[in-house]
Amino acid sequence: MLDIKITRTTCPKEKPQDESKLGFGKKFTDHMFVMDYTEGEGWHDARIVPYAPFQLDPATVVFHYAQEIFEGMKAYRTADDTIQLFRPECNAKRMQDSADRLCIPKIPVEDYIQAVEALVDVERDWVPHSDGASLYIRPFVFANDVGLGVHASKHYIFCIICAPSGAYYAEGINPVRIYVEDEYIRAAPGLTGFTKCGGNYAASIKAGELAEEQGYAQVLWLDGVEKKYVEEVGSMNIMFKIDGKVYTAATVGTVLPGVTRRSCIELLKDWGYEVVEGKLAIADIMQAARDGTSMSLVSLFITANGTPMTFPKSFKQVFNFMRVYVPTEQTWLTP
């Protein structure tokens, strides 16, 4: 168990007055969680301190070789003023998988959750009250060695920051236009597609800009080998319902294992849907649409944003679990 030292700010920021204009990740709370790693000592000096910049040497490893990982999750305020987290252990375990791939020391699941809960408790007044808004939580780890040699760092910083946020897209949970990218790729077998690391996202910016220029909100990525099988959208997983079956790409190294994706699959199976995790060619999807086959799709944003589908029960139920709108037997919420 972490011994977290808390130093509260003496200059609190003004909180947003109009929650309908929050945007995403634009304004940050008063505090942040920080913990250091030193080879031979492990993770140490867990603390919550006033939000402030880091002072880093220009030769810090992360600037040059991108040895860093991150997560994304949310805290929700319920009708009875309780603050809830949605399946934080899934984010903690996924960060461990990312850490293993990037040669970063793992953070124990219980320590990750304790750190998140402690920071959210300090910042509970920043959790929005309105529907569709939440406190976005961004845990991240970066290499902190100084030097230009290419090797795993011996020092790291684990930090968590928070931002009261609205919908990721301006469209909210209304349908968005998605561009199918058949030139650039997001991931390939053996690389880091299943992790949350900055390099994956930096490499996606070019295609995202080209899509935006043509009026699209996001990019649908195809596989990196044959460029014909659907994998995921830039900020979300995606599913297709065709003739009663639900299809989605398997998370076998090139697709990020989304928490909302996992939750919807579990619910769909409980409700009797056949869920197929495997290869689905974009040509087959387009042909099904042309043939008038019974088909719909849902984009599963990790924060539960997405497009409506003809099996709305799954998406809405997951979102309702997050907001505690409906009772559930699922142990997915952490007060």
Model-derived segments and their meaning:
Residues 66, 95, 160, 227, ...:
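Residue-level signal for inorganic ion chemistry
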Residues 1-18, 27, 166, 170, ...:
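Conserved catalytic-core subdomain
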